[in-house]
A protein has these predicted regions:
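Structural preference for alpha-helix termini/caps and helix-kink/transition segments
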Residues: 78-248
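Alpha-helical recognition segments enriched in aromatics with Gly/Pro capping
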Residues: 1-139
Length: 248
């Protein structure tokens, strides 16, 4: 029998909207800063939370900021237990380093959908591998020139684009950009191990799916047919970097 209680309106129990309002007030107070949740909870769940909390507490607001995240898919399919394709953070870091997982997650704005797949993770790994070429210890923490991007609703893709720009400038000899580049990477949790430790991590066995390998081979075959040998060679090098050898 479902749990319930008698009331002037009949037997029943608090709904899930009320549960969240009660927990929020107990642990955070009548008005607090940030409330998060998926885009699918904006209505009716969050709207009902606001209505009942404000009515009960005689306040004009409930949470000062609402953060609604987009959905994560796996190879363009919805992640769900029924499909058996749930990937947890602990699962991901067993296959890739924490830095790679972090950069992959930050590559999309929190409010936008993100497709989790081998290509995303390998691109993130290759990016960090490239960035480590300009890694340096620095005591300077100046990033004011580019941090405004993050202040724009946590625009992480825009911030990462700025890091790419700084890398290019630093690679061409701009020392000021090199310092900013390193500080920006550290701000989002990258460069949390030394260059040597990163090299050791690269040697660990990173597995890629058969589906990904076949896809890249097909792309290379197509590139060769179109006489795009530059692309074909790049795909071959990328696969070689992942421990996959192609022999023509």
């Amino acid at each position: 029998k479902d749990p319930g209680w008698d009331s002037p309106w009949g037997r029943g129990r608090p709904g899930w909207h009320l549960e969240c309002s009660v927990m929020s007030e107990k642990y955070l107070g009548k008005i607090f800063d940030i409330h998060g949740g998926g885009l699918d909870l904006i209505f009716p769940h969050h709207e009902n939370e606001i209505a009942q909390s404000c009515s009960n507490n005689s306040t004009e607001s409930f949470a000062n900021y609402w953060i609604h995240n987009g959905f994560v898919t796996f190879n363009k399919e919805k992640m769900s237990k029924s499909l058996g394709n749930i990937i947890t953070i602990s699962d991901a870091v067993k296959q890739y380093s924490g830095q790679v997982v972090r950069l992959a997650l930050l590559s999309a704005h929190y409010s936008q959908p993100l497709d989790w797949n081998d290509e995303l993770l390998l691109n993130s790994k290759n990016t960090i591998d490239k960035w480590y070429k300009l890694y340096e210890e620095t005591k300077d923490t100046n990033i004011l020139d580019i941090s405004e991007t993050l202040l724009d609703d946590l625009n992480t893709p825009g911030f990462i684009a700025k890091i790419h720009e700084l890398y290019n400038a630093a690679y061409n000899g701009d020392n000021e950009s090199k310092s900013l580049f390193n500080n920006a990477c550290k701000l989002i949790g990258l460069f949390n191990v030394s260059k040597q430790e990163w090299e050791n991590l690269k040697k660990s066995n990173i597995k890629v799916s058969e589906e990904y390998i076949l896809k890249k081979i097909a792309e290379r075959t197509k590139a060769k047919k179109e006489r795009n040998f530059t692309l074909a060679d790049q795909i071959r090098k990328d696969l070689l970097g992942q421990g996959i050898v192609i022999e023509d």
